[in-house]
Amino acid sequence: MSVTSWFLVSSSGTRHRLPREMIFVGREDCELMLQSRSVDKQHAVINYDSDKDEHRVKDLGSLNGTFVNDVRIPDQKYITLKLSDNIRFGYDINTYVLEQIQHQVPEEALKHEKYTSHLQMCLKTAAAGREDQFKEHGAHVDSAQAKQDKADKKATSDIPAYRTPLYGQPSWWGEDDDNKLDKEGRRQDEHYSERPNDMTQHEEEINGNMSYRDSQDQCVYPFRREPSYFEIPTKDFQQPVKPPETQVYEIPTKDTDAVPPVTPPVMQSHASFTIEFDDCQPGKIKIKDHVTKFSMRQRKTAGKEPAPTEMVSAESKVADWLVQNDPSLIRRPAPGEDVYSTKSDLPIHNRTLKGNRHEDGTQSDSEDPLVAQPEQEIGTPDHPQLQRQIKREPEELLHNQQAFVIQFFDDDDAPRKKRSQSFTHNANSPQNDTDPVLKAKAEKRKGTLHVEKVSTNGMGSTAPASKSLSSPSFPQRSNSFRREKTEDRISSAPTTAKLPGKNYGSVGKKSKLAQEFAAEYMREQVEVVKQAAEKPMTLPLSTSILQQPASQVQISSQAQTMQLTSDVRTGKVKNEEEDNLSDAGTYTIETETQDREVEQARKMIDQVFGVFESDEYSKIASTVYRPVIKLGEEEPLASEPSVPHKPIMSSTPPVKLSNGLPAETLIERTGSSSKQSQKWVSRWASLADSYPDASPTSPLDSQKQGLIADDEDVIERTEHQGEADPTVPSRTRRLLPQLPPENVMPTIFVCQESFSDESQRKSLEEPEKRISEENSSLLLVQEELDPDSLSDTSKSDDGVISVRKSAKASNTYRNGWKGEESHSREPSVQRTSVPSNEKKSTCFYVGNDDVGSVKQTSFGLSSKDVIKGPESHIKMKVNLHITAETPSSGKAVNQFPKKDNGSAKDPLSFVRQESFTKETSSSNVLPNKLPHISTHPLLKDLSVTKSNHDYSKETRLILKETETALAALEAKLFTQSHLDEIENTPCLRDDSLSGDSDVDTASTVSLVSDKNVPSHSQKNRIVSLQKEKSSSTSSIQEQYCQPSARERLSEKRRTVPADAGTRNVTKRLGMTRSTGARGSLDFTDEERCSSLPYMPVSETVSSDYEHSSSRHISRRKPFGQTCKDESSRSSNAQKVQQALTRSNSLSTPRPTRASKLRRARLGESSDNESADVERSNISPGTSSANSSSAKSSTETKKPSRLDILAMPRKRAGSFNVPSDSETTSSVRGMFSGRSIDQSYTSRKPAVAESKQPPKKPLPPTQKQTPRPRSSSVKYSSSSTSRRRQQGSDYVSTSEEECGSNHSTPKHKHSRASTATQTSRSSSVSRRQMPNSRQDEEEDEQEVYNNFMAQSVEIAEIARLSQTLVKDVASLAREIHDVAGDGDSQSSSGTGQSTSISSVPNTPASTISAREEIIKRSLQRTCSSQLVHHIPEASLNYQKIPPGSTGLEDFDQNMNDSREDPSKRRARNIEEVIFDNLMLNPVSHLSHTICANTEVLTEKMKILFQNTEKNWEEIEAKINSENEVPILKTSNKEISSILKELRRVQKQLEVINAIIDRSGHLDVPSSNKKTSSTILTSNPLSRTTNNSAARTESQTPGHVRNYMHKSSSSSSRSPGSSFSRDDEETYIV
C-alpha cells in the first residue's frame, strides 16, 4: 500500500518515520535515539498536530540545545517544522531534514497499530471501526487517530483496560490474530475498538501470524511488520496455532467479540505475550502470539488462516515461557501437589504442605484450607467437569478453564496449547494437566499464588464465593482466573450459591460472551479438543487437581464434587465465563469480584497474621486439611467444619482415622477447637506445626493411646501415625499465629478469674494425687485442649499436666513422658504436642478455650482445672515460657502440694495449656519448628510464678529449698546426662527462644530448664519447693519463675532425681548450685522472672552460704512475711511485673541463652554449670552439698552478713539467692520489673556491680538493691559462679567452699584467671575490679547502689575468695593430677572444681576446655604439671585474650567486672603458684642452657672456623628454616624462656649441622633412647600434669632438653618435630 509519511532524513541518509504522536529525541530510551554525547538523554520531543498535519519540535531544556535551520530554538517551546527544515539536536554530527515521502507499506504493516498510526493510510476505515469498538470497550482513545496514537504508545492506557501485554508489549501486540481473523477491516476495526482483537491482529501482523495467513498477500509480510516490540516468532507462534482450528474457532470468537466488544479486548489485551485471547471465549488462546492470546477468535482465525506448523513450535516456546512466568501455572499445583514447595524440612509433610503456598512451608490459616478448598472444588467439582467439558463441551471447557484455548490448540500441539492455557490460568487445569512439565511449573507458581488466594477463599465462604465468581469467568487474568476457577469450584462444590454470588469486575463483560463463545468455540473444537486435549486434559486436570489435594482419596470425592460443582457451575460458569472473557487474557486478578477479592486478600492477610478463623485450617488444616483440599470440600468445611471435614476426613485421611475414630468425629472435634483457636493460628503456622509434629507422631500417639482412646486422641494419633499432613497441623509448633492473645487470653483469664491461686494450689494438691491416676483423662482433656495445637502453651500445659501427674507418680509420668521424650527429644514439648496434635485445631492455646470449657468440663480434676485456670492466666502472659516453664511452674505448684501433700504437678500443666499462644512446643515440635514467639519463656515463668504467689510462704521456702537442692542435683545429673537429656528433653522447646542452641550448649541448662522441666518435674519440683519456699518469701512470682528455670534445669537434668528428704542438703546444695551451675540458669530464671531472681538469689545465697536449715528457716520466716507482702504486692504488681518481665524477659532469656551458649562454647557457661553440677554431684541425693552439709554450720556463721554478701554476688539470679526476706521482698518489689530492665540494659554493669560489691559492705537494705542488680547480672555465668563463690565465701568457709563450693570458687577464680591475668593473690585487685566495675555501673544508679551494697559483701567475699583461691590452687594441682582436664575446665570458667563434676557437668564446654587445655598444656613451656595447670587457666585465659570476646567477653558481659577480678585473682594466684613453682626453675634452666649454648657456639665457631663449612650460612639457613612464631603468652617470663630456648635450639641445630653436616654420624642408641624418653615423657607429663615430677626426676640435661623441646614445641606449630633438636640438646 502506498502511504505518505513524514520522515526525518539524516545527513547519513537514514530515514526516521515520524509517527503521528509525540516522540522523544535523545540518547536513552527515546523513539529517536542519537549517539552524540552532546545530546541529552531526553533532548527534545517531536509532536504531531493532527489538525494541521504538521510536526512540531520542542527542546526540553537540553544543555546544547536544538537547532532548526541552524537557529537554536527556545526551550520548552514548540516550533513548527516545515518541509526541508534542517534540524540538529545538540552537536550531533547528523542533521535531519523533514521530508514527506510516499512509500509502500504492506498491509500487514499497516495493520500494525504503531505502524498504521505512524502512517497515514487507508487504515482509517479500520481506525474508525476500532474507534467505535474502543468506545464500546470504554477505551481511552476517543478517535481512531487518538486510538492509533495510543496504540503507537503501546496502548499503555489500553493495556490495563484490555489486559494489554503484561510486560510492556504494545497494545497492538497479538492483534495479528485479530487482523488475521477479520483482516478485511472488521478485525482492524475491532482491533482498535476491541483492543484485544486489535492486539491480536497487530500481533499476528507483527508476528507474522494469522493475519498474514488470513490474507495471503500479507502472508508475505509476516516478517515485514515494522520491527517493534515483539517481532518475536509471534507470527510463528500464532501461525502454528492450529490455523484451521484457530480460524474456525476464532470466527465465532470474532463474532462474539463483535457482539460484546468489551469481552474480546480483555482477551486480546491479555495476550500480552503475543498470545491471543479470544475476547469472546476465555478458553481460547492463540499461542502464536506467545500463547498470550486466549482467543477462541484466534482459533477461529486459525480456522480461517492456513494452519502454519511453525506456529506450534513458537507456541511451545511461548507456552514454556508462559508456564514459567504464568502465575496460573504456579497456581496449578494443588495443595496436594505442593510438594515442590515443601514449606519445610519435612518432605513427609509435602502433602500437608500442599496447601501451603509459601516456599518456607508456612501457610496462613486461611491459606491452606482455602487452597485445599479451591483446589478441591476446582479440581473436584469443576475441574473434572471442566475437563469433561473441555473434552465434551467447549463452552464448559472454556468456562471452567478460563479460556484456555491453548488446550484446544492441542490439536496441533496439545501440550503446548495447554501450556498456553496454563499461561491463561484457565488452561492450567487441562493444559497443565496435559503437560507434566508445564503442569509442575504452573502448579508450583499457582500453588504459591493460588494457595494464597485460595487460602484466603478458604478462610471464609465469602472469600471463596468471590473467588468462585471469578473462577467461573476463567478467561479472567490468568492468575486470578486460575484461582478464581479453583475458588469457584470450591465454592460451587461446597457452596453452590457462592458461584452465582461471584463478583467479578468483568463478570458482566465476559461471562455471557465468554460462555457463549466458549460454547461455540468449544463445540467447534469439541472434536479437536476431545481428540487432542480431551483425554490428556481431562486426565491432567483431574490428575493435577487430585494431585493438589492428595489425589488418593479425593479423586472419588473430587469426581463427586466435580459433578455437583460443575453442574451448578456449568450455567454459572458460562455466565461467569463471560466475565472471565474480560479477564481471560490478563493476569490481572482484579477482574474477579474485586470486592470479594479484596475481602479474600484481607482474609489471607488476616490468616497470615493468624487472625483468620478457620476451623478447617486449625483442625482439618492440621489433621485433614490436605484431604479436605483433595476432596474439594474444604469450603464447606469452612462453613460447616464438622460436616465437610468429616467426609473429607473419612475419605482423605482414612489412615489418620485408622484408629477407629470416625473422620467425622475427628473433624468435629478439630472443628470446634479449631474455631476457637484457629483464629490466631496462621495456616502456615498450623502447617508448620503439623509437619514437624509428624515426626513425633508416634510418641505422641503412643502417649495418647496409652493415656486415652479419646476421639481427639485418636485423631491426633491417627494424624500423627497415619499421615504426616494431619499430624503436622495438630502438632504444628508454628507459634506466630499464637501472637494474638485475644482468643487465648479470654479463656485464660476466665480460668484465672474462675480459680484463685490458693484454690488452685489446694485443688492441685488434691487432683495431683489423682492426676497420676487420671493421666488418661488428663491427656484426654489435654487432647481436647490440643485443638489449640498451635498453642504450644496448651500442649505444654497438657504435657505438664501429665508430667505433674507423673510427678506424683513420677515413674508413670516419666515413663509416658520420657517415652515421648525419647521419641521427640522434647518430653515436655512432646507432651504438650500430644494434646496439641490431638487437637488438630491449632486454634490457640487450649488453655484459652479448652481450659475454660473442656478442661473444667472434661477433667475429672476440677480442682486441678481450677488451679490451672489462674496458672494458665499467668502462663498466658508467660506464654513463651509456659511450655518449658510450665513444668517448672508446675513444679512450683506441685512442690507446694508436695510439701503439703507430697505431690503437686498438674496445675501448671494447665497453666501451660492456658497460655494464650497454643504452645505446640512439644517433642513433636522439634527445634525445626518455629520458636514460640508468642509465648515467651519468661512470660510463662512470670505467669506461673505469679499464679503460685498465693502459696504459703512456707511452701515457697520449701519449694525454693527443694529447687535449690534439685538444682544442684540436676546440675550434676545434667552434666552426666546432659546429652541424654538433650535428646530426651531437647532444650529446643519452642518456649525457649533459643532452645535449639540451648540444647547444644551447657548454657542450655538454664535455657532448657524450662524445657526440661517435664522430665525432671518431680525432682525440679522438689528443688523448686525448697527454692521456692525461700524465694516465695520474696516473691512467689519470682520464686516460680525461678523454680521454673530451675525446674527446667532439673527437668533438663532430669536424670537427677530430687528427694524431698534431701531438701535441707538440697537447700545448701541448691543454693550452691544456684550460685554454681545454676548461675547460668539463674540468668535464665531471672530473665524469665526478672523480679523473681533477686529474691531467689538471696535465698540461694542464704542456702548456699548458710547451708543451714536454721538460716533457711529464719529466712523463710522473713521471706514468708516478705512473701505475704510480696505476694500481695506481686498480685498487684504481678501483672505489671509480668508485663515487664515479658518485655524484659523476652529479651532477657535470649541474651541469657546467648551468653550461656557463648560461655558454654567457651567452656565458661558449662564451667559454671559444671561447678553447680559438681556441687550436685557432690551432694546430689544426700544433702548434695558435701562441703555444704559439712560446712553448713560454718556457712551459717555469718548468715546475715554472708547472705548479704552472697545475695549481691548471686544477684545474677541464682534461684535461691533471695535469702534475706527484706532484701527479697524489697528487691523483688522494687526490681521485679526494673531488675529485668537492668539485667537487660546493664548486664555487664550489673555483673560488674556484682563484682564490685566486695568493695563496700552495705546493709541488707542496700543489699536488696544489689540483689536486683544481681538479677541483672544474673545473665553472666561469672556472676553465677561468683554467686557460688559468694555462697561459700559468705559461709565464711573457704574450705567448705572448696569442699562443696570449692569448685565454684575455683571455677570462678579459674574463669577469672582465664578472663584476666591480673594476679589473683590480690583480693584488693579483685575488689578494685568490682569497684571499677561499680564505677562503670554507677551510670545505673540503682544497680550502682545495689552494687555498692554488694561491694562490701564482695569485699569480704574477695577476702574469703583469697583463701579459696589458695585452696583452689592446691585443689587445682590435685585435680590436675587426678583429673587433669577437669581443672582446666574450672579454670576456663566455672569449673575449677571440675575435678569431680566440672568435666561431666558441661559436656560441650568441658570438652572444648579440656581439648584446649590439653593443647595449651602441650604447648606450654612450663613444667608439665604447671604447664598443664597454667595452660588450663591460661588456656581459658588465653582463650579469652585471643578470643576474649568469646569467653571473657561473654563472661564479663554477663558478670563483667566481677569475673575479671575473680578470674584475675584466681588466675593470678594459680599462675603465681605454678609460675613460681615452674617458671623459676625453668627460667633458670633456660638461662643456663642459653648461656652454655652461647659458649658452646662460640667455641664451635672457633673450632670450625677454618673448615670449609660456613657457619654463618648454615646458621642463617637453619634460622630461616626454624623460624617459628613464638606463642603469645601473657607471661613475660615464659616468653623469655621460649625465646632463649629457641635460640638455643637454633644454635644447637647449627652446631649439629656443622659437626655432622652429612648426617653420617649416629648418636649412641642409649642417647637416642634417653632423648626419646625425654621427648616422650615430656609430652606425657604435660598431658598428665606430671611433667614437673618427671622433669625433676630426670637429669638436668634431660630437663634442659625437655625445657628446650617444650619451648620449641610450644613456639612451633604443634606438629613440628624437634627430635633432632632434642637429641642435639640432649647430647649437648
From Swiss-Prot:
Compositional bias ranges of the Low complexity kind: 1176-1193, 1261-1280, 1312-1328, 1381-1398, 1606-1618
Cysteine-cysteine disulfides: none
Any matching Pfam family: CEP170_C
Entry annotated with the keyword Cell membrane: no
Keywords: Cytoplasm, Cytoskeleton, Microtubule
Function as written in the Swiss-Prot or TrEMBL entry: Plays a role in microtubule organization.
Protein name, as recorded: Centrosomal protein of 170 kDa protein B
Source species: Xenopus tropicalis (Western clawed frog)
